[in-house]
Amino acid sequence: MQEQYNPSEIEALVQKHWHDNKTFEVTEDANKEKFYCLSMFPYPSGRLHMGHVRNYTIGDVVARFQRLQGKNVLQPIGWDSFGLPAENAAINNKTAPAPWTYENIEYMKNQLKLLGFGYDWSREIATCTPEYYRWEQWFFTKLYEKGLVYKKTASVNWCPNDETVLANEQVQDGCCWRCDTPVEQKEIPQWFIKITAYAEELLNDIDTLDGWPEQVKTMQRNWIGRSEGVEMTFGVAGHDKTFDIYTTRPDTLMGVTYVAIAAGHPLAEIAAQTNPELAAFIDECKNSTTSEAELATMEKRGVATGLFAIHPITGKQVPIWAANFVLMNYGTGAVMSVPGHDQRDFEFAKKYGLAIEAVIKPVDGEVDISEAAYTEKGILFNSGEFDGLDFDAAFNAIANKLVAEGKGKRQVNYRLRDWGVSRQRYWGAPIPMVTLADGTVIPTPEDQLPVLLPEDVVMDGIQSPIKADKEWAKTQVNGQDALRETDTFDTFMESSWYYARYCSPQADEMLDPAKANYWLPVDQYIGGIEHACMHLLYFRFFHKLLRDAGLVNSNEPAKQLLTQGMVLADAFYYINEKGARVWVSPLDVATTEKDDKGRITKAIDKDGNELVYTGMCKMSKSKNNGIDPQVMVEKYGADTVRLFMMFASPPELTLEWQESGVEGAHRFIKRLWKLASEYIAQDNSEALDVSKLTSEQKALRREVHKTIAKVTDDIGRRQMFNTAVAAVMELMNHLQKAPQTTGQDRAIIGEALSAVVRLLYPIIPHVSFTLWNDLGNTGSIEDSQWPVVDESALVEDSKLIVVQVNGKVRAKITVAADADKDSVEALGMNDEHVIKYLDGLTVRKVIYVPGKLLSIVAN
């Protein structure tokens, strides 16, 4: 073997072997247990970042580990290749999104291969290809036929100057990113999929996701947001109109002092006809882009409509206010306001001088609402016939009365809204719907699919090419003129079913059910927790749609989910002559000074600028603190980068990028290489004979098999890859100190190295592949078996016992593994150190914890 570790040479040879032998290409095999390992596929932005590397290294470690368990392992890869960034890049680079995207795919594909990931490249997909989105379009038409798709108007960001829709990220400080025109809200028709039809199942089935993190499950439960309440009808004084309000706290109904409605509520529109102040307020609200998330922090404002609501039980009139904290697209667009028992309502009432009444008090005291609302559940008072009831009794009594009088109904509501899948962008899959000359809207016939997105286009940065090209929309259906839909799908559509397409990527149908049901569900899914409430929910929803279409037979798409943490790096900046921050790459920092705790106190870049250090931050372009994986691979090798990624932190926590840590990982690999080289250079013909081993040799062999047991558990069950690496490093320390004098010495080292290269194979596959063969093993390491623990090697001949005198450790003694209390006590009492500390004392008590501790109490 080569004496020196040369990563670039080794990795090129091993990667060529994998490519030539199609090592990771798999087919269905009913005789083997399958394992489907999947990392969330990347957007082809142009270059991999360290977040990608961490995600894909974790996936590769799991896949390679399962392969050595003898399983039929599928690990595919592809490209989430539609989306707005490609449009922006095309505008900036004066090209079209398609060539920019395909060039990026090729570049990033090469980067992935250089990192040694064991993907089945024969299954590669790109979601921007007609071969992929054709089946998405087909499935959408089937959902439409089942009544799960509908069209309605919804609000979008609208630039009146360019007359175009803007994505949220194209709105900067309320203005168009391109022309700085104030952005308006505009209602336009959009397509929706009825995810709410599956809300209950999506919620209930969270309980079956035993292999998913609790945090993700909690986030999804909250996002779906099931609540039990009452929907009641309020009248409007002086009008024959009514409106509905939903509440989960009907126990507070008797404390309603005003009603708040959305600016877009029909009652607000009516009142605004004679109320200029209200009309102006409505216009202001319509042109703001307030999201649900922003409601909690924004200033609460409102205008009285001049209308009064009639309380459904008391008949009392309460004022109706239009308020900016009520959204028309959430609930009924109206809320009953109980300022005595809701803090937001309390603050609004104080601001506008509205009445505040208390109707709930603690079980064991009085209520004080002079400074804040009392928001806990309690006992009703000031509530007429409901006085004295607790929450549950009041809920039922008030609900029953409303139902009996035809003024309300019990209702289960969900926070979850239907999925709006229309995007007014170009670079996405065209929505396969057409409008006939008579206005009828129908799905594109199957024989006209796919509806192709033209790729040879010019991006002007203003309007989608397929919206600008009036000829593109023209088509014929059954001999009739028709116009195609010019909106494209939300890119979450593509990422909601890609995992299933990998099972049969060349199939001339959406899925080959036999292949899909062999591989699905995914056994291990890996990706960031930021996807908990969007992608991961749509992912689950789409799987249920596929199931109900008869394409898959499982209820959930993935058994286990691992959410890896972010990768952080040092961030530095200086202030330039214009007073602006200039962020400096950590690679361009020339010198640093640190305090006694290792914290950076001073830094200077290569140009001599004194820098401000802001700490460890998420790697990002904005802070210029991203580290190019390719630079690190060229400098240290892919195995070193992979090893650092797995060792530096538990997978679900953030990882702090430290090049000193990378250097440490590199030194470890060189130590392993050196030990193997020294071993191979000797006469290793003597076979291991456990009956001939000395106690020291048995102890070393015990460490080998303890390490096998720990690493197997750490990777296979606990998924604590960092502690698995630490265990192998500790074993390596023992092996480096061990003698290689006798034949049995070397036989144990040989057994240990054979185990170590397999234990590390998932993490540093190139080195392991090479050393496996250099150590004289036949066949490829990919076809070997994971090392098995020899239970007999774990049996200890002796035990190390700690001896305490009056609670302080005074000695450590070695005893036979089966020694009884009397013999241990005798040895302990006769130890020279113990004798010294017992001098002049009388032993009062001796406690023995078998195999661990001998405690002597004396005075």
Curated annotation (Swiss-Prot):
Enzyme class: ligase
Main location: cytoplasm
One cellular component term from this protein's GO annotations in UniProt: cytosol
Intervals of motif 'KMSKS' region: 618-622
Gene Ontology biological process: leucyl-tRNA aminoacylation
Database matches in InterPro entries: aa-tRNA-synth_I_CS (IPR001412), aa-tRNA-synth_Ia (IPR002300), Leu-tRNA-ligase (IPR002302), Leu_tRNA-synth_edit (IPR025709), M/V/L/I-tRNA-synth_anticd-bd (IPR013155), Methionyl/Leucyl_tRNA_Synth (IPR015413), Rossmann-like_a/b/a_fold (IPR014729), tRNAsynth_Ia_anticodon-bd (IPR009080)
Short sequence motif 'HIGH' region: positions: 42-52
Localization, UniProt: Cytoplasm
UniProt keyword annotations, A-Z: Aminoacyl-tRNA synthetase, ATP-binding, Cytoplasm, Ligase, Nucleotide-binding, Protein biosynthesis
One matching Pfam family: Anticodon_1
Family to which the UniProt record says this protein belongs: Belongs to the class-I aminoacyl-tRNA synthetase family.
Protein name: Leucine--tRNA ligase
